[in-house]
Amino acid sequence: MGTSSEVSLAHHRDIFHYYVSLKTFFEVTGENRDRSNSTRAQKARAKLLKLSSSQFYELSTDVSDELQRRIGEDANQPDYLLPKANFHMKRNQARQKLANLSQTRFNDLLDDILFEIKRRGFDKDLDAPRPPLPQPMKQEVSKDSDDTARTSTNSSSVTQVAPNVSVQPSLVIPKMASIDWSSEEEEEEQVKEKPNEPEGKQTSMDEKKEAKPALNPIVTDSDLPDSQVLARDITSMARTPTTTHKNYWDVNDSPIIKVDKDIDNEKGPEQLKSPEVQRAENNNPNSEMEDKVKELTDLNSDLHLQIEDLNAKLASLTSEKEKEKKEEKEEKEKEKNLKINYTIDESFQKELLSLNSQIGELSIENENLKQKISEFELHQKKNDNHNDLKITDGFISKYSSADGLIPAQYILNANNLIIQFTTRLSAVPIGDSTAISHQIGEELFQILSQLSNLISQLLLSADLLQYKDQVILLKASLSHAITSIRYFSVYGPVLIPKITVQAAVSEVCFAMCNLIDSAKIKSDSNGESTTSNEGNRQVLEYSSPTATTPMTPTFPSTSGINMKKGFINPRKPASFLNDVEEEESPVKPLKITQKAINSPIIRPSSSNGVPTTSRKPSGTGLFSLMIDSSIAKNSSHKEDNDKYVSPIKAVTSASNSASSNISEIPKLTLPPQAKIGTVIPPSENQVPNIKIENTEEDNKRSDITNEISVKPTSSIADKLKQFEQSSEKKSSPKENPIAKEEMDSKPKLSNKFITSMNDVSTDDSSSDGNENDDADDDDDFTYMALKQTMKREGSKIEKNNDSKLPANIVELDLHESPESVKIESPESIKEITSSEMSSEMPSSSLPKRLVEDVEPSEMPEKGASVESVRKKNFQEPLGNVESPDMTQKVKSLGMTGKAVGPESDSRVESPGMTGQIKSLNMAGKVVGPEADSRVESPGMKEQIKSLGMTGKITAQESIKSPEAARKLASSGEVDKIESPRMVRESESLEAVGNTIPSNMTVKMESPNLKGNTVSEPQEIRRDIASSEPIENVDPPKVLKKIVFPKAVNRTGSPKSVEKTPSSATLKKSGLPEPNSQIVSPELAKNSPLAPIKKNVELRETNKPHTETITSVEPTNKDANTSWRDADLNRTIKREEEDEDFDRVNHNIQITGAYTKTGKIDYHKIPVDRKAKSEAEVHTSEEDIDESNNVNGKRADAQIHITERKHAFVNPTENSQVKKTSHSPFLNSKPVQYENSESNGGINNHIKIKNTGETTAHDEKHYSDDDDSSYQFVPMKHEEQEQEQNRSEEEESEDDDEEEEDSDFDVDTFDIENPDNTLSELLLYLEHQTMDVISTIQSLLTSIKKPQVTKGNLRGESNAINQVIGQMVDATSISMEQSRNANLKKHGDWVVQSLRDCSRRMTILCQLTGDGILAKEKSDQDYADKNFKQRLAGIAFDVAKCTKELVKTVEEASLKDEINYLNSKLK
């Protein structure tokens, strides 16, 4: 080849390998395509053509390397060809650039290189043997040799004959052809022609040539005609592709030269012929030629046929031979495999047999070992089970307590059972055999039944409401474990994995741990705890079933008190029942409601004695949905179905008979250490000593009253017995028939009720023993401070009783009175004051005491006779005391020792003490039984006539406080002292001397008094926590006198007073309308009960109310006192703003709780009638105007219920209680009675002195550590009294204003009216706040329910949203007024916060601004946790903002009032 000189064999081989790889690449990828017509390809190939052999070798090497890099499967190969040190730098760069070519361009490069390799002839493998044929080449060689022989033999003749004509063209043509062709390219063309031929044909030709080489000489050019040879050559040229340019390196190889040679060869023989032959041939030229042609064609055809036949035979022979060879090979391989397999099979079989034998032996040994292991495990487990666990001392010390409830043995037994259970469960085999699972299920059930029995015993010792959650969890866990075992035994371990049962038992363990952590383990040394715990459990039975607040498990040790036989001491139950909050809802009450919750208002009950529902879903009152535990206790009754079990047992037959008529017996808590001071009724004219003892933790005892004619050391049991006997005597026939009739018509309360009232007051240890656990009590420290303060007050009062207190006032310290216990809330104080103070009090004893205690200095100042003083004093007690005994005894309290007519009747309003002691006939005259004091109400102008004066006058007094209303029993009751004033009045009763007959009784208006038969409106009020009407309850027969500070004034819900209860409500309450009268018809006519306006609107808000001085003062009044009182009122308000309801700061500062009676002409009020205490009950001048008429002129007494008090409906009349602005603290504004004293012209100014006030001054000196906010007004100084008089004068001037407040009607309030005053706005906001808070509480209760729907929550949220919108609008309009700049400063952001709450609620609940609740598809779905949490958060924000809004408006209103008062003082 021509390239052999330039390219070495090694390079040739390399290029050939490159050619193979490139060709293989295109065959595999199918990328090869014809690019001969592409101009781009032609240019590229032209450049390759210019490359030298070495350059082309390098290029083909680089392209091949790049191809290998691209198709390589090595993941770690580089992204380009790495440079090589032996390569030139530019070549390395060019190699790297190849990696940048796209696949299409790179394929084009490969195609061009492949083309150039073919063109240059490097596509031949030099190592491969050359094919024996190429036929054409051999023929040409033979032909050439023949030609040369011919030419050599004939050369002479040719040259001799003539120049060959064809020589010239043969020489010319090669010259021209040399430009295009070369001999080397011709050879390459011939070589390339063969691959272009069909492969089958080519292979067949090769086979023929190899099989029969002898045939090759047959087909030669010499044997063929020249024309055929030329035709063949031409066809071979035509077969070569025209697209490929053939370059022939040797010019002699050109086909044109070959044609010329053929022509010369054909002409040579013709020229050699002799002339004779030529002539002959010329003669027959055509025939000869035709014959030759035919012969040759025939021969050619025969030869072709022979060749085809031979080729076919050759192909068949070769195929057969190959088959035979294959068969032989297969047979040989089979033979080899058979031999190998045979040998392998034999060896394997031997090994397999040996292994099988070994396996058998090992399996037997393994089974034996497993059996032994299982036996050892079972043995070990049995040993472990026999080893009972013992609780170590460390464990005992950690989880045990002196008050622990759970015996340690229970825990050990439970632990052993659980271990036994889990051990048996772990032994359960994993299988699907139901028989096995049933058997195991039985065993597990047996173990679990023992565990269940043990847990039930454990719960008996610890099942207190305090641990209700832990108990419920333990019961639920046990139930879940039982269910798991049931399913496990039924479905087996296949469907129910053992882990489910194990988890269920684990839950039981966890629940037990929770209970142990809470209830603690009972140590072995504490053997007495079992009995105490059992007692506690029985106590729990008396608690309301709906109580959800946990009860305290431990109770303070109580000193044994010898009570009357059959009297069940309710101290223990009360001590923890007082902490029980009877609510159906487990929702934690809002702090805004806790203030009212802590007031012990007796709940209403239906006529059948069954308590009404403890809450309404959305009440009309502010705190109607929140019931305090004390409320629940005090209001719970003994139901027919024993649902509520009263802890108090009736003792005497009288009490039992009376109990049948009692519609409601409050369940009150008695301090465990309190001793009940009983009043021993003396003879008719004898005044029994009233001694109230209180043994607290310090065992402090004090005689509250100066003991006069009674043994102070008489035991409580004796006093109770004597008192009951006296009550029985009073109900004897010797008494006035009218009084007797009253006694019969009224239910009698025995010790049962006394103890129940004692329950109201709770001792520190009982009520607060476990308050540390109560997270809701934020005021524990303040509360304790108040208790200490009150204790000190009691001691000081006892010491300074004679010197500091007016003679007519009997001081009772909260801690000195048997009933006085730590009162946790104003409500509890009211409860005590109402129930205990309303305890029956022998009137005779009181007047005598009062007379003896009268200070001589006071009388000269007053310029009044002793009788007048007595009368005054008597007026006070009359207002305070109401009981059948009092009715019987104090029948005619002629202050001169004469019977006082019923007009001396006084009306007391406890919370504010706004109640008026009706004008007692203080004329010093005997008030005949017919002495009339008219009770005038818009609805009832009937005169309540006094009872037949068989020495008895029932001064009727309507108790207006919430408790008073409840406590007012039927006519048999002693006047109830409902508040500090009532207490003070009752105290003053004792001051009334011996002149008062013992048979005279001051009777407070029973709830049922109305007109002559006063059957119509029973005084019905609503609890703070309940919207249900509360019936009046008969007070106990024992008079317990407790002076409570003004905190008693706090009242319950705004709805606490119902508007003019009708007789129907009386019937519902269970009190007979006529029978429940306190007074006979005469007394009803004569009784000076003042009309109470029917519409009562009590402001109840969270904010403290400034206590206004409401009592009417005599003419000699000091302005200083009024100013001081006003300051005190402000101070009280400030303090109360930050105090919860349970704070008894009122107890220390009782300032302005004055009972004002109607319009007073001060010129008619004697100077000597000046009241001694701030909590004075003044009969108005109108009352006094007609007091000269002893025979029964009637005066119209109008009760004006002040802004802070609950107006209580006068049960004796269809009285209309004016709606007054009400706040939680019933700061009494004047109650104005248009009251006439028919028996005396003496102006009855009854001042009730509050012990809290009297001790206030001392409190300042002795209790510096107490809350500085408690301010006290010492009552012993005349200057202070004068100041009080002045303040009362100012209060009288403000009566009209306050009357307007009492007439406020929220329904008529115009939100858009810019002229609304702050006072009106405050009233409106307070009313609206009531509705908002009640609805919020209902909403929170609903949220707590797991199955509440979203629609229900949206409905309540919509109601809240509408009310807040109205509140915001009303406040915004008021803030826009320039006169209310003070409100806008602080109220702006409060209103904005409320708006934000409304917006959030609107978005969350998808509400509309118009208040129409559109139905949503999701209303029927259960509310999800996220929705509930967000809604609860918004509700709490609303409650907080509404509280703040009311407080803000009240502060602004107070500032205006202060400015007004300052202007008046100036």
Swiss-Prot record:
Compositionally biased intervals (Basic and acidic residues): 140-149, 191-212, 261-270, 693-704, 718-747, 816-830, 973-987, 1171-1181, 1193-1206, 1276-1287
Keyword presence, Protein biosynthesis: no
Biased composition (Low complexity): 543-559, 831-848
Ranges for region Disordered: 123-163, 181-223, 261-290, 522-562, 676-782, 816-915, 954-1086, 1098-1130, 1171-1246, 1276-1312
A GO molecular function held by the record: MAP-kinase scaffold activity
InterPro entries per UniProt: GIT1_C, GIT_SHD, Spa2/Sph1
Major location (coarse): other
Annotated GO biological process: bipolar cellular bud site selection; budding cell apical bud growth; cellular hyperosmotic response; cellular response to acidic pH; establishment of cell polarity; establishment or maintenance of actin cytoskeleton polarity; invasive filamentous growth; pseudohyphal growth
Protein location: Cell tip
Pfam families, alphabetized: GIT1_C (PF12205), GIT_SHD (PF08518)
Coiled coil: 286-388, 1169-1189, 1275-1302
This protein's GO CC annotations: actomyosin contractile ring; cell cortex; cell cortex of growing cell tip; cellular bud neck; cellular bud tip; incipient cellular bud site; mating projection tip; polarisome
Residues with PTM Phosphothreonine: T220, T1179, T1251
Annotated TM spans: none
Assembly: Interacts with SHS1.
More details: Present with 274 molecules/cell in log phase SD medium.
Protein name in the entry: Protein SPA2
Organism listed in the record: Saccharomyces cerevisiae (strain ATCC 204508 / S288c)
Source organism phylogeny: Eukaryota, Fungi, Dikarya, Ascomycota, Saccharomycotina
